[in-house]
Design a protein with these regions (language model features):
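Alpha4 helix (beta4-alpha4-beta5 surface) of REC/receiver domains from two-component response regulators
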Residues: 3-4, 12-37, 42-46, 57-59, ...
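Local beta-strand N-terminus motif with an aromatic residue
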Residues: 32, 136-139, 143, 191
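CheY-like receiver
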Residues: 40-43, 47, 56-86, 207, ...
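Conserved acidic segment of CheY-like receiver
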Residues: 67-78, 83-107, 118-120
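Acidic, metal-coordinating helix/loop segments flanking the phosphotransfer/catalytic sites
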Residues: 98-140
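Active-site residues of response regulator receiver
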Residues: 142-151
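Long C-terminal appendages of very large multidomain proteins
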Residues: 243, 247-283
Length: 283
């Protein structure tokens, strides 16, 4: 099928067990784009469609338009089959909240289409390729620790990848997830959040961590010297009412450290009367 229709995505859905996992490991999957563990969750079908759409539209939407990207690095079929529906549900819900400020249906649709993309990497090389290509629009990274690197399973591949990312970008939000608690020490060294894959409330923990670190939800400007909050921006009206009281040093602090999924905050950084020291910020 793949030889006849190379541009049509092919996805395999299978109930998962240890026997199925062993068989898949031995099969030639070169003709398959993705394999997912099917447990009857219909949200997985939506996530698969969105994942394929994001991959196909990434070149134009990210490079040309400036849409941002969340990168998931994970090779466990069972795990990414569980996480992706939760991740997409969260991103779509946040986009719906943002779109409620739209003036009409057309603008609302455009805001929904401008949601952050989600891309899946299953090897070290695939993760590096995506990061190198879209690093300027990366909103955050969620990475496993153990996955394939240079053709073999590397128990520290995720740490090596995140170490490289951190050397390129000191402030990009990183979430390291692992079933081995000792990897939490490595996450702390990289100034990354750590999630235990064995936790029964992992999906909840992931949503909370992304909400806190990836710039979703209400945005609070803080005093960079004291850490005290200055003002919280919930929507464009709040931004308009409080724009005059935000100090330049607070703006510089936030603009130089993170990217934001909320377009109103990014527009603020672009329109602000910038001193010379702000000219090189990646707005």
């Amino acid at each position: 099928m793949k030889r006849l229709y190379p541009y049509i995505p092919i996805v395999v859905l299978t109930p998962f067990s240890h026997e199925v996992s062993r068989r898949i490991a031995k099969e030639d999957l070169s003709g398959v784009d993705y394999v997912f563990s099917w447990l009857g969750n219909v949200d997985l079908l939506v996530a698969i469609i969105k994942l394929i759409e994001d991959k196909m539209n990434a070149e134009v939407d990210i490079t040309s338009v400036g849409v941002q990207l969340i990168l998931l690095v994970e090779d466990s079929i069972r795990f990414y089959s569980s996480i992706l529906p939760n991740l997409y549900n969260f991103v779509l819900k946040q986009s719906q909240i943002f779109s409620t400020e739209a003036l009409n249906d057309h603008e609302r649709m455009l805001r929904m289409r401008g949601r952050p993309k989600v891309m899946l990497a299953r090897t070290y090389e695939e993760a590096m390729q995506i990061y190198e290509k879209y690093s300027g629009n990366m909103l955050g990274i969620v990475s496993d620790v153990s996955f394939v690197r240079a053709g073999e399973k590397d128990k520290k591949a995720g740490i090596k990848f995140c170490t490289y990312v951190r050397s390129c970008d000191p402030y990009l939000p990183l979430i390291i997830e692992s079933s081995e608690r000792e990897n939490q020490k490595e996450a702390i060294k990289l100034n990354a959040s750590f999630l235990d894959k064995n936790s029964k409330k992992l999906p909840v923990d992931l949503r909370k961590t992304i909400l806190k670190n990836f710039g979703f939800g209400d945005f609070t400007f803080i005093n960079p010297n004291t850490g005290e909050p200055i003002v919280t921006i919930k929507n464009l009206k709040d931004l308009q009412d409080n724009i005059d009281i935000i100090p330049d040093d607070s703006l510089y602090y936030h603009a130089s450290r993170i990217t934001y999924p909320d377009g109103s905050i990014r527009v603020l950084f672009f329109l602000w009367p910038k001193p010379c020291s702000l000219d090189k910020l990646p707005i």
